[in-house]
């Protein structure tokens, strides 16, 4: 019943994330259950909803639509997680604060959402060198039991996801659409098992892809990650926006440092100059020592086991990558 009630809120025109958070805050402050507020509609007014919105919310048609969607989630083993629950990713909640999504939908191993993780962002039309570097970075992380987080798009994202899975690691697919339309892509279908992945979406389950949502989900990728690796970024678009948001939210941003950046990576120098940490290499292998240092710093604060870097030794200042 509770899931259908939450979906009823999400489906109502005029109710967005901010209004849902106000309702949740009201329930906590007044010690009400969600069912209580649906049984006593005047409580919605006390929670700050307008009368016309309340009428839409409580319509029979919307109630039936929400119940049908809840049933479909159950049939597909999809979890609805609110920010009030312990299963909600705590790092996301801490990183984004009041801007974290009030509701997530997840399918797969949801414990990965609260695991040490590094996010990836990069071009859909990445260079072969960029793809290779992303795969090598993900391999090192997987070998050190660090979850790889990315946006499940072609190019950089898929290279990072696939490499993590190929190297017996785990990955989080952060969707720019609802979780119901999502499918397992051919490139990774033979690598998937019940424990090594989770799909997660902040959008209504039947939402189709759009560019605005692709930008919006950047916050979830960043919020789930203790550090971000920017592989290749042009001077506009989703990767550029993700890099800017990482810097703005204080998420450590690591940037592949190319000796002669091409168009696919023309904004990489900008991010290094703006506070990103350069990732260089030795014998073509990315040196992730500072990434592991960030993870270990967070592990010590959380009293968890630190990771031991498998990156090349011999200092952080290595050689820039050639495209």
What kind of region is each of these model predictions?
Residues 1-132, 139, 321:
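Short, positively charged patches
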Residues 2-3, 83-323:
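Glycine-biased, small-residue-rich flexible motifs in mid-sequence functional cores and linkers
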